[in-house]
Structure formats: structure tokens, C-alpha cells
Design a protein with these regions (language model features):
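Feature captures the catalytic ectodomains and active-site-proximal regions of enzymes
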Residues: 1-368
Length: 368
């Protein structure tokens, strides 16, 4: 997909705005034209379950035949968990919420990267991501909002930044999660958000379509079935994802048989969506060099080009601009661009995401 058009598609911000609109939360928009109010809403987020994967493997599991396929929706750039869940949680695009990728430079630091999923205690999550979440706004209007996910995510910097405001119920394992979800939906009006990462983990380690990945999808199928059977009557259950996943067969290691590290201060982002921070005064030269070397294998943009192109949305806050790479490289096809300091970790993974190919950005929107 054209990187400049990705934010013009129906995405996660449209979905959560629509859901909270049916719960009568102020200043939300019903982009799905659901029209009627609903008192119980459940949103299941399956990390790494792209539309392409559902098309190829969903028919092996009966629950995917039973669900209504509402439409294909799209992640924003970069197509990665930290950015997508922030868009889902806030209802605004990345240029506004400022969560621009897996790792970005902390402004006015000693060239320190913030890993959004692991966080850094020196960074205040509420100051880093200042936009009130839809969860916070819904609670203020009297909606019971519950976040059901693994216990390890409770209170994390990322949870506080992107998904704050909900009552967090830590639950490990299918049965515990199903019980927590059904209990939380007794209240009216109520909203439950739940997150599972097993499919993403299997895709990274073994690849989409691998035995490990199919086992994870079978467990997810079982989970959705049990949630459907256990929730109170009248609950609407939405199922979506944060990105797809590409099985990579091609790689470039920065600085190996190339001079792409010349004038580079810091490597951020991830293998399919790089934020590159450059020595002052060398930006134009470095962008030209990367563009010439990578050719059609990646799209290379300067910061100003990325902003003008609408890569992170039509509005880019000052905070977002400061965090953005001086150069942004978006891998095409199934290429990955590897940080030489992380060769073992990055090259050992089969599945990757972050780019703007259809496989990266197209995700399903399913409804019980």
C-alpha cells in the first residue's frame, strides 16, 4: 500500500471510536454506522493475526466460519504492536499520540532509545503519551471498562501510556481469562478489552503457518468459542488484530558490505520499519545514500518527507516530530533491515512486521 494513503483507510481508531459511540461516550464518532446503542461490548485483540493469515488458515477452525466478517481494516504506520494498540486505546493516529514504533529516541537524552513495550522507568508514561484514552473517557461517563490480559502487563509503562483508565484484571490461561471477561460484562453499560500475544510470538519464532503458529491459532479458536458461550446475552464481541506478519527470506545487515552506517548516530524502530538518527548536517547526504543503495527494496524518507507524506497521519505533534527518525526506511516485499548490534535476535526471527505491504497492514474485523 502507498505509505501516504495508509491513514486514509478504515483503521483501529475508527473501530474503537465506533464501539464507544454505541456506549454513548461523548465526542466519539460511529464510523461503522452501527446506529443502535449497545450496553455490552467486548473487543478481543489477537496480536499478529493478519487478514492474509485468516484467509489462508481460518477455514481449518470452525469458529472462523461462524464469525461475521465485517470488513478488512488497516493498521497505521508502523504496523507494530506499540503503535497499533496506542491508536486503539486513544482513538487518534500516531502523529497525535506519538507512539511511533517499537523503539524511538528519547528527545534531549544521551541518544537513548525507548523500547515502548519494555519501557524505561526514567520516562513518565502519562507525559510521554498525553492524549486521554477512550477508556478514561468512557469511565468518566459511567461505563464499566475492564482490561483483561496477562498479569505481567499490569501497571507496565506501556499499559499506562496507551491503555490507562480501565480496571486491569490479570489473567493467565484461557479459563481464567474467559471467567474474567464474562464477569466484567455483567455490568451495564460495560466494555471489556482483552489481548492475546501467543500467535504473534509463534509467528516471530517459527513463522506464519508453522506447526507452532497453527497450534496457537487453534488455542485462539478455542478461546473465542468459550468467550462466545460464556458472556451475558446481548454482548457484542469484536475480534481484530494489530498487524499482520511477513515470513522474511531477505535481509540486509547495516554496515555489512555497505556503508549505510556512515553518519548514523542511532538505529531505532524494527527490521521492517527503521527510525534512523543522523549526525547534524548529514541528513540529506545520508538519505540519498540509503535511497540509492536500497532502491526498490525499501522506501526511504527524510523526516520532513514523512511528515509531508502523512506517514503518521495528517497531524504531527511537536512531541512526535522530535521522536521521529531523521530517516525512515520502510522495507518492501519480505525484506528485513538488521541492526548490526542485534543480528542474532533479529535474523533468527522468521516472522516480521512494521511495513506497509498488504500482508503487514491488512487485519480482519470479525463479529460474533
Amino acid at each position: 500500500m502507498n505509505s501516504g494513503k495508509i491513514n486514509q483507510q478504515f483503521g483501529l481508531s475508527h473501530l474503537t471510536n465506533s464501539i464507544f459511540s454505541t456506549l454513548n461516550v461523548a465526542d466519539t464518532t460511529d464510523y461503522l454506522a452501527l446506529k443502535q446503542a449497545n450496553m455490552r461490548e467486548c473487543l478481543i485483540l489477537i496480536d499478529g493475526m493478519g487478514q492474509d493469515a485468516v484467509n489462508k488458515y481460518g477455514d481449518q477452525f470452525p469458529i472462523f466460519e461462524e464469525l461475521k466478517n465485517v470488513r478488512t481494516i488497516y493498521t497505521n504506520f508502523p504496523s507494530t504492536t506499540a503503535t497499533s494498540l496506542s491508536t486503539l486505546g486513544t482513538g487518534v493516529l500516531p502523529g497525535v499520540h506519538g507512539m511511533l514504533g517499537y523503539t524511538v529516541r528519547v528527545p534531549r537524552s544521551d541518544n537513548r532509545l525507548l523500547n515502548a513495550l519494555k519501557w524505561d522507568e526514567r520516562v513518565d508514561p502519562v507525559m510521554w503519551q498525553k492524549v486521554p484514552t477512550l477508556f478514561e473517557r468512557a469511565v468518566l461517563t459511567g461505563v464499566s471498562v475492564t482490561h483483561v490480559a496477562a498479569k505481567r502487563y499490569e501497571g507496565s509503562g506501556f499499559t499506562q501510556a496507551a491503555l490507562r483508565g480501565a480496571k486491569y484484571v490479570g489473567a493467565n490461561g484461557i479459563e481464567e481469562m474467559v471467567t474474567a471477561i464474562s464477569s466484567a460484562l455483567v455490568a451495564q453499560p460495560s466494555f471489556v478489552y482483552t489481548y492475546l500475544n501467543t500467535l504473534d510470538s509463534a509467528g516471530h519464532s517459527d513463522g506464519v503457518g508453522s506447526d507452532k503458529w497453527l497450534t496457537a491459532l487453534a488455542q485462539i479458536s478455542e478461546f473465542i468459542t468459550k468467550v462466545k458461550e460464556s458472556v451475558p446475552t446481548g454482548t457484542r464481541i469484536w475480534i481484530t488484530s494489530d498487524h499482520g506478519m511477513v515470513n522474511s527470506t531477505k535481509q540486509i545487515i547495516l554496515g555489512q558490505d555497505n556503508d549505510l552506517l556512515e553518519n548514523v548516530l542511532l538505529i531505532g524502530g524494527e527490521p521492517r520499519a527503521r527510525h534512523i538518527y543522523i549526525n547534524e548536517g548529514a541528513q540529506e547526504e545520508t538519505v540519498a545514500k540509503w535511497r540509492q543503495f536500497l532502491g526498490n527494496s525499501a522506501k526511504v524518507l527524510s523526516k520532513s518527507e514523512a511528515i509531508a507524506d502523512g506517514l503518521f497521519g495528517p497531524v504531527v505533534s511537536e512531541d512526535a516530530s522530535e521522536r521521529m527518525g531523521d530517516l525512515i526506511a520502510i522495507a518492501n516485499d519480505d525484506l528485513i533491515i538488521i541492526d548490526p548490534a542485534r543480528v542474532k535476535e533479529e535474523s533468527s526471527m522468521v516472522g516480521h512486521h512494521g511495513g506497509v505491504t498488504d500482508i503487514d497492514v491488512e487485519i480482519p474485523l470479525l463479529l460474533t
